Amino acid sequence: MSDDDFMQDSDQEYDFEYEDDEEEDTGDVDIENKYYNAKQTKTSDPEEALQEFLSIPPLEQEKGDWGFKALKQAIKLEFKLKRYQEATEHYEELLTYVKSAVTRNYSEKSIDNMLNYIEKGYDDPKAVQCIEKFYSLTLQCFQSTNNERLWLKTNIKLARLLLDRKDYHAVARKLRELHNACRKSDGTDDPSKGTYSLEIYALEIQMYSETRNNNQLKVLYQKALKVRSAVPHPKIQGVIRECGGKMHMSEENWKEAQSDFFEAFRNYDEAGDLRRIQVLKYLLLTTMLMKSDINPFDSQEMKPYRNDPRIFAMTELVDAYQRDDIYRYEDVLQKNTDLLADPFIAENIDEVTRNMRTKGVVKLIAPYTRMRISWLAERLRITEPEVMDILSFLIVDGRVKGRIDEHKGVLELESREDADHVQAITVLSEAVGNLFNAVFKSTDGFQPGQGDFMNSMADQSADIGSLDDTMRSMGSGKRGRRVGLTQRAY
């Protein structure tokens, strides 16, 4: 072969290789165009977009970025269209790309975002089964890749799913596994995994809060507050503080509960979490339980929510409570029954209502010395047994001086004048008793050494003398008492 023939063959070979590269580039461009065209139509025509995305992976000679991206979009669309079985199958296909087709960091971030996306479907029972399958497939896939971060994140999400399902035994097992993964070989917490530890504590605190295990809740709550090696997401801090507030409420520690609910509200607000509205209601609830006259909306963080319609009913309740307006308070409760849809509010509002009615009773009985229980019940719009219960508490507590005649259904109050008369008679009775003992039981006369006794007798005589005036005034006192008792309410 001549040199010219050789050069000609070489040129032909070179041209052929160049043409192959050009065809490959053209193929990539076609796939890219197909991908972006599908993205543009996924809102207007999700069905067409879904078919376009699913047609991309077979076009690649080897698994690559465009197939990975197309499958991600297809799975999200299928999940949105509630085609959970198809979404699960394509997610399983997507996981085959993570070992070689895409980089480790990109695959980890993409999978984590995908799991965050599907978490929005917790309200649909069918979606929950699909979500759990996604978690299971993810853990199986990354178990062999030694990707601890994604393993921890996925297991935390799975524990949260189990908690939402109230499968507490499964949650407890999963949390033990996670705690062990966040500890060093000597059993102490690993500072490098502080953020994960705090998330795990938050889940465990939620579990004990829901199961009313206050002993364990206290221990974990204190542990969580002492974690300093983490930069927690404000939502996690909000969860911890909210559970802390509920714990303090169960112990009737209103002040600490208010402090924790405020911190929970502030953190949820910072995270943009809608839970802030519910916690704000709890904060207003503790304001009433503390019997505080301070307007909670004076704080900088709460001012923007002063006129928020979502908390209008609670704001009205607080205003009525602070004004001692029992009628308005009861009207707000009757017109806003949805307030009691929250079990926590329903459980604690009774204490506020009782305080409100107690203040109403004290206010009503103030001008009178005698009144019927039925009259009080009618004025307060409650039953007679409820009035009796409140009055009994006030009498035992010493805030009301009086007695209840259950047979007649009447409350009789002691006036100040009545109390003075009773005290005077008591002193007189004791003095007469002492005099009787001295005069009639001493048969041997006065003996030497009884000077102290004589002095004592002189003092008693003085006491009796001073009581004469009191006894003389009892006639007019009785008249005054009779006048007082005519101040009645029936």
Swiss-Prot record:
Pfam entry (one): PCI
- Where located? Cytoplasm; Nucleus
Q: Which InterPro entries match?
A: 26S_Proteasome/COP9_Components, PCI_dom, WH_DNA-bd_sf
Q: Where is this region: Disordered?
A: 1-32, 469-490
Q: Where does this chain mainly localize? A: cytoplasm
Spell out the Acidic residues composition-biased ranges: 1-30
- A GO CC term attached to the entry: cytoplasm
Entry keyword set? Cytoplasm, Nucleus, Signalosome
Gene Ontology biological process terms from the UniProt entry: protein deneddylation
Q: Which residues form the PCI domain?
A: 250-418
Annotated Gene3D superfamilies: 1.25.40.570
Q: What does this protein do?
A: Component of the COP9 signalosome (CSN) complex that acts as an regulator of the ubiquitin (Ubl) conjugation pathway by mediating the deneddylation of the cullin subunit of SCF-type E3 ubiquitin-protein ligase complexes. The CSN complex is involved in the regulation of the circadian clock through its control of the stability of the SCF(FWD-1) complex.
Q: How does it assemble?
A: Component of the COP9 signalosome (CSN) complex.
What family does this chain come from, according to its entry?
Belongs to the CSN2 family.
Q: What is this protein called?
A: COP9 signalosome complex subunit 2
Organism, as annotated: Neurospora crassa (strain ATCC 24698 / 74-OR23-1A / CBS 708.71 / DSM 1257 / FGSC 987)
